[in-house]
C-alpha cells in the first residue's frame, strides 16, 4: 500500500509540473508574427484600458516595425466639447520630444564643420557666462547635449525669467552669471535650458531662426509637412485641445508658455508626421546613418533616472534592452517615443493630458510587440495555440471531475465507516511536501506575467488574454488544488478490512 501511495503521489506531481512547463513553453514559443486584425483588436483593448485608467480624453498611437506601419490610429477625442475624434492627423504638443530634433541639428552642424562639440558655449553666444562657487566656468556644447552643464533644472523658474524674456537671447541674458549646481561635465542634471541654449547656438551659427532652420533642414526633407512650433494658445482644425484633471474629470487647460522654450519643448506634430521621423531614426539613409547612430550614443550616465542608463543627444538610452526613448510632459499634454534600433521597431504615444499612464501604455505596448525578442504580439501568438489550450482545458476539467468523484466517494465511505484516518510521521512529511509543491506551482502561475512578459501583472494581462487561455489557466489552477485534496485524502485515509 505504501508503494502505491508513493507512486500515485509521484505521478500526480509529475503531471502537474509537466502541465505547468507545457504552458510556459507554449507561451514562449519562438514564433514571429505581424500584427493582424485580431492582434490589433487586442492592442485596442490594452490602449482603451490604459486611457480609461488615466482619464485621458484623446490619444494617437503609432507602431512601426521593420519599416512598416502596424498601427497608426486615434483613440478618444482631440476636442471633447465638440466631439472631434482623435486621429493620426491630430497635432499634439510633444514637449521634451522636441529635444531629439535639436540634438540632431547640432550634430549635423558639427558634421558640417560649422561648430565643434567641444566649443565653449560662449564662442557662439558671446554674452553667456555662468559661475560655480563664485568663479566663471566654461561650458561646452557637448555638455549641453549630455545634460552635464551644471545648469539647474529649475533655473527658468527664477524671478529673473519672466514672460517678458520671450526670446532666446533675452532669457540667456537674464540668467547670465547665475550659479551652477555642479561643475560642468561632472554630473547629470536634466534642464530644459541646456537645449534652449543649443537652439540659440543653432540660430547664431545658421543665421536663421531655430524654427526656420529645423523646418527647412529636417521637417521638409522628412515630409513632416504638418509639423510646426507653438506660437500662441490658438487652436486650428487639427490641433488637439489640452486638458488637466480636476479630480477625475479632464477640463480644458491653456497654461502660459514661453517661446524661448521652443527648442526643448514646443514642437507640435502628429503620428502621421512622426511616422517619417521614426522610420528615419530606425532606418536612416546612408548619408545620415552615422549621424543618427551618433545621436543615440551615450554621452552621460543618468543615475537615478527610471529605466535609463544614460543620456544621448536628446534621448535617454537603456543599454540592457537596446532602447532609445524620451518622454514629454507639459501641464496639458504628454508624449512618449520609444525606439529599438536593434529589433527595428518604434512606438509613439501622444496624448492631450499630462498622465502617468502614457509611459505605462508604452511599456504595455512594448511588452506586446516584442515580448523579449521573440514575436510581434503576444496575443496574436497565443491565438495560434487556441486548440492546444482547449486540450489543456479538457484535460484539466477531466482531472477536476475525477478529483471531485474520488473526494465524494471518499466522503461517502467515511460516512459509512468504510475508511479510517491514518496518522504517521511519513504521511505528515508527504502531506507537507505535497502542499509545498502545490503552493510553489501556484506561485509560478501567479508570476508567469512577470517571468514571460517582464513587468506585468494578471490584472493587466486578463484585459487582453483570449478566453481559451483564461479557461486553461483557471482550470489548471483548480486542478492543481483538486489534486492536492486527492493526495491528502489518499494519504490520510485507509479502507477498513471487511
From Swiss-Prot:
InterPro entries: Bact_CellWall_Synth/Modif, Beta-lactam-related, Beta-lactam/transpept-like. It is a multi-pass membrane protein. The chain crosses the membrane at residues 6-26, 389-409, 433-453, 471-491. One of its GO terms (cellular component) is plasma membrane. Keywords: Cell membrane, Membrane, Transmembrane, Transmembrane helix. SUPFAM superfamilies: beta-lactamase/transpeptidase-like (SSF56601). It is found in: Cell membrane. It comes from the Bacteria. The keyword Cell membrane applies. Its precise function is unknown. Has no penicillin-binding activity and is not involved in methicillin resistance. PANTHER family: D-ALANYL-D-ALANINE-CARBOXYPEPTIDASE/ENDOPEPTIDASE AMPH, PENICILLIN-BINDING PROTEIN 4. Has two of three conserved motifs typically found in penicillin-binding proteins (PBPs) and beta-lactamases, but no penicillin-binding activity has been detected. This is Protein flp. It comes from Staphylococcus aureus (strain COL). The gene is flp.
Amino acid at each position: 500500500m505504501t508503494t502505491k501511495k508513493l507512486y500515485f503521489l509521484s505521478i500526480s506531481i509529475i503531471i502537474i509540473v509537466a502541465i505547468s512547463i507545457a504552458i510556459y513553453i507554449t507561451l514562449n514559443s519562438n514564433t514571429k508574427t505581424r500584427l493582424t486584425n485580431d492582434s490589433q483588436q487586442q492592442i485596442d483593448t490594452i490602449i482603451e484600458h490604459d486611457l480609461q485608467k488615466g482619464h485621458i480624453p484623446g490619444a494617437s498611437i503609432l507602431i512601426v516595425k521593420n519599416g512598416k506601419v502596424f498601427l497608426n490610429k486615434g483613440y478618444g477625442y482631440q476636442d471633447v466639447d465638440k466631439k472631434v475624434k482623435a486621429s493620426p492627423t491630430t497635432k499634439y504638443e510633444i514637449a521634451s520630444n522636441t529635444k531629439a530634433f535639436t540634438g540632431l541639428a547640432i550634430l549635423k552642424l558639427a558634421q558640417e564643420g560649422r561648430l565643434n562639440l567641444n566649443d565653449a558655449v560662449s564662442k557662439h553666444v558671446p554674452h553667456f557666462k555662468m559661475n560655480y562657487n563664485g568663479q566663471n566656468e566654461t561650458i561646452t556644447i557637448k555638455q549641453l547635449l549630455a545634460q552635464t552643464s551644471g545648469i539647474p533644472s529649475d533655473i527658468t523658474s527664477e524671478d529673473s525669467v519672466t514672460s517678458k524674456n520671450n526670446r532666446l537671447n533675452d532669457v540667456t541674458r537674464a540668467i547670465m552669471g547665475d550659479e551652477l549646481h555642479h561643475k560642468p561635465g561632472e554630473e547629470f542634471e536634466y534642464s530644459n535650458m541646456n537645449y534652449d541654449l543649443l537652439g540659440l547656438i543653432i540660430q547664431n551659427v545658421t543665421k536663421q531662426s531655430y524654427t526656420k532652420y529645423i523646418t527647412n533642414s529636417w521637417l521638409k526633407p522628412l515630409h513632416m509637412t504638418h509639423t510646426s512650433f507653438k506660437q500662441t494658445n490658438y487652436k486650428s482644425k487639427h490641433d488637439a485641445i489640452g486638458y488637466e484633471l480636476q479630480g477625475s474629470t479632464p477640463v480644458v487647460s491653456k497654461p502660459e508658455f514661453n517661446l524661448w522654450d521652443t527648442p526643448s519643448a514646443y514642437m507640435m506634430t502628429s503620428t502621421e508626421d512622426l511616422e517619417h521621423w521614426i522610420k528615419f531614426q530606425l532606418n536612416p539613409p546612408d548619408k545620415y546613418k552615422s549621424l543618427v547612430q551618433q545621436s543615440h550614443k551615450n554621452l552621460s550616465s543618468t543615475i537615478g533616472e527610471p529605466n535609463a542608463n544614460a543620456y544621448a543627444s536628446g534621448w535617454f538610452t537603456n543599454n540592457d534592452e537596446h532602447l532609445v526613448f524620451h518622454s514629454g510632459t507639459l501641464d496639458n499634454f504628454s508624449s512618449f517615443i520609444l525606439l529599438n534600433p536593434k529589433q527595428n521597431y518604434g512606438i509613439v504615444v501622444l496624448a492631450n493630458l499630462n498622465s502617468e499612464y502614457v509611459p505605462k501604455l508604452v511599456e504595455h505596448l512594448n511588452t506586446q510587440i516584442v515580448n523579449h525578442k521573440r514575436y510581434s504580439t503576444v496575443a496574436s501568438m497565443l491565438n495560434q495555440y487556441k486548440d492546444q489550450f482547449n486540450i489543456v482545458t479538457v484535460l484539466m476539467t477531466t482531472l477536476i471531475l475525477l478529483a471531485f468523484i474520488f473526494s465524494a466517494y471518499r466522503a461517502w465511505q467515511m460516512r459509512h465507516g468504510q475508511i479510517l484516518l491514518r496518522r504517521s510521521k511519513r504521511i505528515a512529511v508527504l502531506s507537507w511536501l505535497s502542499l509545498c509543491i502545490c503552493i510553489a506551482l501556484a506561485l509560478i502561475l501567479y508570476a508567469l506575467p512577470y517571468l514571460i512578459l517582464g513587468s506585468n501583472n494578471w490584472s493587466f494581462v486578463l484585459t487582453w488574454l483570449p478566453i481559451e487561455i483564461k479557461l486553461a489557466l483557471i482550470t489548471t489552477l483548480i486542478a492543481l488544488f483538486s489534486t492536492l485534496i486527492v493526495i491528502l485524502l489518499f494519504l490520510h485515509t485507509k479502507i477498513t478490512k471487511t
